[in-house]
């Protein structure tokens, strides 16, 4: 009951512009994860980057269950199973980047598409966290039941062999 589990893995590509560049990123993300891609939109206008509000500028995929486990194993292998302690937040979640999509098995470089990087975010939880999200009789999670940084590091080390610097 106390061991953390992987709730979800979010894979995000921030392209910074709409058009063919974003479509290429969506195709790459769809091929890597095998799941449908969702577009991300700009929250505000940034004239310095010529980005308008509500313009599509990125894409993401949320993986859960067995797909999340398999993708996480592959992604951690790409970063050589080493993470930095600063990549963990206070809730035990971890985020890391992958510089090139060509590092994934089965992906090759295409000069027409280019090279894309991506961010991977792993959300950890303990069984029983639903009590704070349910509509009826919602309760706060006690501090002892929350996932801490040390719990997350121990879980990733034990389950995936990750070394934290």
Curated annotation (Swiss-Prot):
Protein name per its UniProtKB record: Large ribosomal subunit protein uL5
Species this protein is from: Methanosarcina acetivorans (strain ATCC 35395 / DSM 2834 / JCM 12185 / C2A)
Function in brief: This is one of the proteins that bind and probably mediate the attachment of the 5S RNA into the large ribosomal subunit, where it forms part of the central protuberance. In the 70S ribosome it contacts protein S13 of the 30S subunit (bridge B1b), connecting the 2 subunits; this bridge is implicated in subunit movement. May contact the P site tRNA; the 5S rRNA and some of its associated proteins might help stabilize positioning of ribosome-bound tRNAs.
Molecular function GO labels: RNA binding; rRNA binding; structural constituent of ribosome; tRNA binding
GO biological process: translation
Domain of life according to the entry: Archaea
UniProtKB keywords: Ribonucleoprotein, Ribosomal protein, RNA-binding, rRNA-binding, tRNA-binding
HAMAP family in the record: Ribosomal_uL5_A
A GO cellular component entry from the record: cytosolic large ribosomal subunit
Family: Belongs to the universal ribosomal protein uL5 family.
Gene: rpl5
Statement: the UniProt record of this protein carries the keyword Ribosomal protein: yes
Matches recorded under PROSITE patterns: RIBOSOMAL_L5
Keyword tRNA-binding (UniProt): yes
Assembly behavior: Part of the 50S ribosomal subunit; contacts the 5S rRNA and probably tRNA. Forms a bridge to the 30S subunit in the 70S ribosome.
InterPro entries (alphabetical): Ribosomal_uL5 (IPR002132), Ribosomal_uL5_arc (IPR022804), Ribosomal_uL5_C (IPR031309), Ribosomal_uL5_CS (IPR020929), Ribosomal_uL5_dom_sf (IPR022803), Ribosomal_uL5_N (IPR031310)
């Amino acid at each position: 009951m106390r061991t953390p589990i992987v709730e979800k893995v979010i894979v995000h590509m921030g392209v910074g512009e709409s058009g063919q560049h974003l479509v290429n990123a969506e195709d790459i993300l769809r091929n890597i994860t095998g799941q449908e891609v969702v577009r991300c939109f700009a929250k505000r206008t940034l004239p310095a980057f010529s980005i308008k509000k509500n313009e599509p500028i990125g894409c993401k995929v949320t993986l859960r269950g067995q797909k999340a486990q398999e993708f996480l194993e592959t992604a951690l292998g790409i970063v050589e199973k080493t993470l930095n302690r600063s990549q963990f937040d206070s809730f035990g979640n971890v985020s890391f980047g992958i510089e090139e999509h060509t590092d994934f098995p089965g992906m090759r470089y295409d000069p027409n598409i280019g090279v894309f990087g991506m961010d991977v975010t792993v959300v950890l939880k303990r069984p029983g966290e639903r009590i704070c999200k349910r509509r009826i009789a919602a309760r706060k999670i006690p501090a002892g039941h929350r996932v801490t940084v040390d719990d997350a590091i121990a879980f990733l080390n034990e389950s995936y062999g990750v070394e934290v610097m």
